[in-house]
Amino acid sequence: MKLRALLAIVFLGFVTPLLAQPSIDIETGFVSAVYNDVRIPGDQGTLFSLTDDLMAASSFFYRLRAGYKIGERHNISALYAPLSVKSDGYLPYDVSFAGVVFPADSALDAVYKFNSYRLTYRYDFVLRPKIEFGLGFTAKIRDAAISLKSPGYYAEKTNVGFVPVINFRLLLHMNDRLGFLLEGDALAAPQGRAEDILIAAQYKINDKAMMRAGYRLLEGGADNDEVYNFSMFNYGSLGFTYTFNN
């Protein structure tokens, strides 16, 4: 019995690398804020907008993903997705933010940072010539910070936390090379919500390389005594995927 178990482990050790397909994915482009409303603390601070009350600049972004496909249906990936957007301007009223009161009509510089680290498992339930569909789970770590600065004043609110979300992927094949992709992570709860969704056209260059172009939506926020923040970002996205064992 022990010999059989040992042989099974050895067999899996040899077979799994043969069935596995490691990959890397790079995504880049530009991101702009649609809205970004902030009140810190959530029950006592001044509510203001980093997009309507201040002017938010578009910025360059990138994302890096390492993937590992086992067999035909099991997918594991790790994602690093940094985001930093700056805003500036003047407000005609005092702003209470993170325990600091910023005087009215002073020059304000704000930085909104929302970096995320995600580990995803997805199972592809449907694998057909014209359609692919999978569902899974993403463990997301957010590393967020909002800072506000004016001459002689500075305050920052940081937040690191765990967010479980549902992962999904739908791919429609138009022909052997062209397809339309809908994928993302999303979940809503009483404490808040989070959506990160990509819609893109995908083109197969060869058996190892794939490129895509599309639109990404990042939206979500939380409302509690500590933080009130809801934001939405539009991404113009270009991506490239390379599979090593294919």
Which residues are covered by each model-predicted region?
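Transmembrane beta-strands of outer-membrane beta-barrel proteins
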Residues: 25-29, 79-81, 134-140, 183-185, ...
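Transmembrane beta-strand segments that form the barrel wall of outer-membrane beta-barrel proteins
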Residues: 177-192, 217-218
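Solvent-exposed loop/turn segments connecting transmembrane beta-strands
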Residues: 129, 160-162, 185-196
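Short glycine/proline- and aromatic-enriched beta-strand/turn motifs that initiate or cap beta-hairpins
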Residues: 20-83, 239, 243-246
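Extracellular/periplasm-exposed beta-strand and loop segments of Gram-negative cell-envelope proteins
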Residues: 34-59, 82-114, 142-161, 169, ...
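Repeated loop/turn-to-beta-strand initiation elements of outer-membrane beta-barrel proteins
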Residues: 73-76, 129-131, 176-180, 208-211
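Predominantly the C-terminal beta-signal and adjacent terminal strand-loop region
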Residues: 193-245
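Residues on the lipid-exposed face of transmembrane beta-strands in outer-membrane beta-barrel proteins
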Residues: 26, 64-68, 119-123, 137-139, ...
